[in-house]
Each structure stands twice: as C-alpha cells, then as structure tokens.
Amino acid sequence: MEALRSFLRDNGRIHFEGGRVMTPINDNPTRAMRVVRCDETMAAVLRGERFLVFDGAMGTMLQQAGLEAGELPELLCLTNPEEITGIHIQYVEVGSEVVTVNTFGANRRKLGDAASVADVFAAAIACGKASGAKYVAADIGPTGALLEPLGTMPFDEAYELFAEQVCAADAAGADLFIIETMADLLEMKAAILAAKENSDLPIFATMTFGEDGRTFLGTSPQIAAIVLSSLGVDVLGVNCSLGPNDLRPMVSEMLKASTVPVMVQANAGLPSIVDGKTVFSVAPDEYIEAVAAMVDEGVSVVGGCCGTNPDYIAKEAALVAGRAPVERDVAPACGITSASHATLLAGRDVATIGERINPTGKKKLKAALREGNLDYVLGEAISQTEAGADALDVNAGLPEIDEAATLVSLVGKIQGVSPLPLQIDSSDPVAVEAAVRVYSGKPIINSVNGKQESLDAVLPIAKHYGCAVVGLALDERGIPPTAEGRFAVAQRIVEEADKYGIPRSDIFIDCLVMAASTNQAEVVEILRAITMVKERLGVRTVLGVSNVSFGLPLREIVNATFLAAAFSAGLDMPILNPLSARYREIVDTWRVLCGQDVSAQGYISEYANKSMSAVAGAAGAATVQGSASAPAPAAGDAFDDVADFGLRRFVVTGRKANMPEAVSKLLETCDAMEVINGHLIPALDDVGERFEKGKFFLPQLMASAEAAKAGFDVIKEQGGSGAVADKGSVAIATVKGDIHDIGKNIVRMLLENYGYTVYDLGRDVEPQAVLDCVREHDIKLVGLSALMTTTVRGMEDTIALLREQAPDVKVFVGGAVITAEYAEMVGADYYCKDAAESAKVCGEVLGA
C-alpha cells in the first residue's frame, strides 16, 4: 500500500499536526465495518425505535439575551460561558434531550488566531455538560469556502478542518456529532468521512435546501438521503432552509429514500425586521402543527433552527412524549447519483453507461491522457451526456501515467460539466479509492472479481464510501465457460459483499461478454447467466455490449442484436456507445416494452415525426466510433453548429477549450459586436433560462460562463477590445460581523466570467470600507451578502451609509437568510436569490 500512501502524501491528505493520520482502507478492511459508541437509549434512537428532541436556535437566544454575538459567536463559550450554559439550561428545562453546543463555525479557517479549535470545543462542550442535558452534540457547520472544482478549497483541506473539529470534540467528551446546514454534498461528504475516520460517535447529518427544493448545487432531498444513507450516517435530515410547512414535501422525499432515521430542524418561518429586531413569521402553534404532520409521516428526531426558542421546543417535547415513532422499512435505492442527478432502477428498468472515456482501443483518448489533455475527455463526457446516456464510465488505465492522480482529476473535471453519475473504472484499488473519495454523489465501482485478493481490496472501499459495485464473473481460474460457472463466481461475490453489509441493491454482476467470433457457444451461456443471476441472487446486471462483435464486420448490427437479447434475458445496465442511434433506438423501444416509458410518452415524443427510412438512415450513419466533436443533439436543443461553428453549443455545454476556434472562425465573416450580440449573449441567455427552469445547476452555469469568457478573451486578443470594453464595475462584500463568503465568491466568479470588473472586499467588511471602494473606483453597483440573521444589521448599516454618502449607488443583496421582504426592509434596491440573478441586475443597472 505504499503507492496509496505516496499518493495521499503528495496530494496533501495528511491530517493537521497531532491528528490521526488516515489509514488507507486496504490496510484495515475492518474500518469499513463501523461500530458506533453510544448508550442503549441512543441505540434505540438510531434504530428508529425512539424519539429524540434536540434544542432550538442559539443565535436567536443570544439576541434575546441582549448579547452581542459579534463576528465570532463561538468565542462566547470562552468569554461568557455562564450565558451560553444558561441558554442550554433553558432548552433542557422544556424537554431538550440534546443540546447543540456553540461550535457551528469553530473551524481553524474561521477562528484564525482568535482561539484554538481545541479550546473552543472544550469550552463549548463544558457549557453543554453543565446544562445537565442527556446528550451533548458537537456542532459542525460548513467551512465557509466552496470546494473544488467549482471553488478553490481542495477536498483534503476541508477534510482536515473537519477532522480537527472531530478530534477536539471527541477529546472534550461530546456524545455525538451534528453536521448541519450543509448545501454542498461534497463538503458534507468530507465532514462525514472526517467523523467516521477519527471517531466512533454517532453522526447526525442535515442539509439545507432552497425554495426550489434543491441546494444551490442542485442536490435534491432524495439524492441527499441516498448518498448520506450510503455513507453510513446514523441520522439524516434537513435543517434551516425554510419554515416547517415549506419543508414538508422535502421531508417526505427524504423519508421515502432514507434507510436511517430522519430529523427535522426547521426555521420559524421567514425573518423580518420589526423595531430594529429580527422576528420570524411562524409562531409556536403553527410550527408544531407542521412538525406533527412530519412526525406522523415518520420523522423521529425533532428540534429547531433559526428563530426557534424554548417555546417551540417545549411543544415538540410534548408532541412526542410517551409515543413511539412510526415504523419505517425503506429498502435501499438501487442506483447511483451525482450531486444533482440520480440514475435509479426499479422493476425491469434499464439505464445506459457511456463507454467512451476508456482508453482501450482509442488512440485519440490514449494520446489525450498521456498529454494531460483533459479538454478532449470533457468533450467525450459532454457528447455522451447530450446523447442521452444515464451514466458515464471513467477509466484512466494507462501504464505510463499516474492513474490515481489522473482519475481524481478526471472525476472533478467531468462532474463540473456533466450532471450524470459516474462509473469509476479501474483494476487498481489505490486509484479507485482516490477517485471515489473525492466524488460528489454515489458512484459505482468497476470492478471487483471473484479472486479473494480483489474481494478483500475492493469491497471495503465500496462499503466505506457508500458506492455501488460491479462484480466480474471471473476468479483465479479465469472466466468460466458456462452459465453455471459464471453464476457460481457471482454468488461468491454477493456472499462476500453480504459480510460487509453491502446491500444487494448496490451489487451489479457483469457476466462478461466474449467475442462471438471466437467463443460463439458462450454467447448463449452469457444470456443464461444473466437470467440466473437476476432470478437467484436478486441483484442487478451490467454488461459491456460491444465486446461480442470483436473480429466481425458491421459490428454495430451484431452489438445491437445482442443488446436486445440481453435486455430480454434481464440485463439492467449496458455499457455502450450512446452516440449510436441504433443503440438508442433499441433502448428507447425496450423501455416501452418493459413499462419503464409509461404510456410510451418518451418514445412517441422522439419518434412520432420520424419515418422508418429516416430512422434507418440515422442508424446506418452512426458507428461505434462516433465523434466527440459532433455529438448527437440533446432533446429539445436546436443548435445550428454550421451557422455559428458550434459556439452556442460550446457555451451551453461549458466547452471552454472549443471556444477559441469557434470564435475565430466567426470573426472571419462577422465583426466583434455581431459575434457578441448575435451569438455570445444569446447563448448566455439560453444558459440563464435553463438555470431558472431547474434544467441547469450552479456547476453548469459556471462552466458556461467560463466558456463565454474564453470567447470574449479571443475577441479582445484579435483586436476587438472596443467591443468588449469593460462592461462595468461592481463591488461585493460579506457584511460586518459575518465571515461566510461562499455565496459572495460564487457571485464574483460568475460576474467576472460575464465580463464585469469585480472588486471583492472579502468578508466581515466595515460599512466605511464599502463606501471607500465606491468612491475610489466610481462604483455604481454594490452587492452585499449575509448568512446569519445576527449580521443582517451590518447589511442595513452599510446601505444606510451608502444612501447618505453615495445616493446614486444601487445595491443588491442576497444570502441564506435574506428574502425579498428583508431586502426591502434594509433599503436594498434589488434582491438576488442566486448568482444568476446578480448577473441580471448588473445588466440592468450597468447597461451591459
């Protein structure tokens, strides 16, 4: 395992000084079998047999007590422990069994030199224990930075921040962890792994969602529940976000997908300012009605978030007193996810895995991987996504490159341009673990086989990281020639996976296709094996279809015929070339015949206006070679690649590397203004519309903006600087007292890519500093961000100063706690619910 240690060391995966250095899974397979340290009462909670009552908001109580939370409220545990303990006691007295200590932002990045993480956690947990609560929960919130590839913080840096908190909390005597208010699924994963790998305390994990029912990165409650359940948290749920009534549909979605108990800690509605104080719209009686409905549906852990106080918690404690939770028996979902897209299977459903990011037999891809040309690989990912694949295979298996490092890079890059789940394809467990560790979502590993060495190496990785896994029907003796032999190997793999607690819904058996040209008799055996595996083992199947035609002419015809036969035998996930029209037709038709395409709506939409000759012609024209530069169009697209040399497609799909050539060709016949106003701007408008409709999420939005910027840069370089002169300047800041800057940083990146000059003043910014920037740079538009209700006053003060000293300046505001009503109350001109809205405001105010 020295290779893995070297990779982790070279890529920064070494914990902070004094921490516990992470042991690779393969050196300690038992680490995948997590045993939780807790008492029997908590064990009953984790089994879903007992209710558990958390406390409510800390910030709300600090405000009511008249305490100034300041920029680092966690420091109050050191400077004013009596008041913090007093707040905990108030919650305990009304029925809170768990107090959440005041450590939400107590990570090294936020604390800086103000205090050590260990000291803050020790003081906070001492306050919690002094309250007499049954359990003390160590609170772990977001780092305040956006993780790569969208942001700048490496996964391992986030992991180290969380690991330091975990070790400090465990050493100080915490009873459990509550990882909360997470909006980035990858950041949540880093925190969960830090907790799993550095402690054996129970892990409660909750995410926060917007009004559209997704996080700002596009994660739905269903996906969150699937991924967190697979990662092995003990309780999952939702906190903050919205009021309890607004959360009900999201909680219902989680309850249907979560295999562990579900918790809810809602806000007391939306905040507003009355007489200079923050008040919330939902009173305790209305709050408890919504919570009661969620409890009746299956929620078993309750508490409160922003705006709640002991009055709310008292009603929750009374609600569940003397009751047992609703019995829930949720089968694990069968399928895989990215952060924003789930490919799930039920009944006879089928899903396709795009095969084109695999260097075997592909000279161009091999050359691209050797040269580090990831743009070519991203083109393949986008092409397959547009063509309708349900997942993408990613393989970097070349002996002359660093496979682990390349695979890690590919995973991050591909997840930035494609929403599809990925199949991590490698025979090297080191590379597999490196890639799945930084994957956002639930991937599938390809593969494990029947050799004991392989089982011992790969299955612990699949369990620890919550992955599905492909099992190859081969062992030390090779590939059995008969269906019975293949089945025997598959059975061994499934039984070994059972020992690790890997559910059968996460196991996909590959019965291994042999070439009909050399192993003709085995083709029928493969089909028999698929049926046996499905019927006797209760697992799904996967198959690399194109191998069957090796050595034969007109390979696509052979592959297509075999694909149809395999579907009939029970194949669930074929690995194929999605650019082939013939394959797509077979998949679309099978989905009608097996009932997956209800009422044949998808089939009718795709083929109603096509003649048989047109379909046959398309099938004949498509080959298994395909073309990454000329992908099949996605449904509903009307790209005219001839008229604009692919420019609109490249912007919409975020293909930054393709932009220089497309723009240069357009400039041969168009002037710069025509390229901008006739092509680039409409393409960005298209992207914005897709974002508003929920078809695109933040990663796609940012990738498209970067592609557009690449186009603007070419115009500048070729003498069109006048046409792309600075579109205007905007100053942005996180207001005084608030040290959270994820949202602000996203706005900065987007606006810069749209061509605006952005003066980013940082976080915890004094009102005077904003005014100084406005005066120095003649700023006409200012953007302000706040995450916490306790810091909205800083936003109001900044706007008041600007109104007095620079009345012509327009102000837009945003942030987790900000609403349109709030924006109006603090005197802002515009409310921006997301980064895309800020780009619209810039266009309106700055006229560009």
Question: Can you annotate each of these PLM segments?
Answer:
Residues E2-F508, M514-A848:
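Domain-level signal for soluble alpha/beta catalytic cores
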